């Protein structure tokens, strides 16, 4: 089992990670990863700067969700080669809780229900756990409620959400909005959204997109993993990358997403067959 903070003394102070911001927030080089013995990521490279929004698109099975799980440190996803540097720190040496405390947030494609645990308790526990790891004073009930009410106002969300069990009985749109609200409270530096638009009708999609746009800032970067370009109509990315067979094979601006919508992934895959060199992977 990994230590939460292995390595040199700097790595034992997560607050240093959050303060030591460099222009390139996330740098992935030649990343290989496998799941249950099967290689999924096959030499992926990518650079993300603070303030940028990057969309990761690709067909089913290309490795999009695997990338998100590898970055967040989920068990069962084995990195076999390559490096991931986050704010100058080797991200792969950190346990999942240390990555979260350092500002890495993953919004799941299928948010889980936690019956009997209301959102207020869950969010306060999560926030204070991160503050404790960073050596910061935990928030008491009054301080936390003040913070949460401020976030509810900014995000234009009803306070009814606070009294409901986490995702229990929520619609698909409510679950996704709840994750965006969690992100607003936890204030990550790197937010990874794994198919946040999956299963949403147009009204729910617009609400989720509004939340994401509200949280865009020069200090925060987004990786938006998506299969379709419709989310990008409402959250306009700085860069779009096409992931195929475990590699980024093409990069561009939003016009690349429109090209994919018109011609599909087949043309991209045909021009970059498996085993060929990666093209345009680093933005």
Regions found by a protein language model. Name each.
Residues 83-99, 167:
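ABC ATPase NBD Q-loop/coupling interface
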Residues 26-28, 41:
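Conserved structural motif at the start of ABC-family nucleotide-binding domains
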Residues 112-189:
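ABC-family P-loop ATPase nucleotide-binding domains
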Residues 239, 243, 247-270:
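Conserved beta-strand-loop-alpha-helix hinge in the C-terminal portion
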Residues 57-59:
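The feature captures the beta-strand-to-loop junction immediately N-terminal to the Walker
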Residues 192-196, 203:
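Walker B catalytic motif
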Residues 205-218:
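Helical segment within the ABC ATPase nucleotide-binding domain
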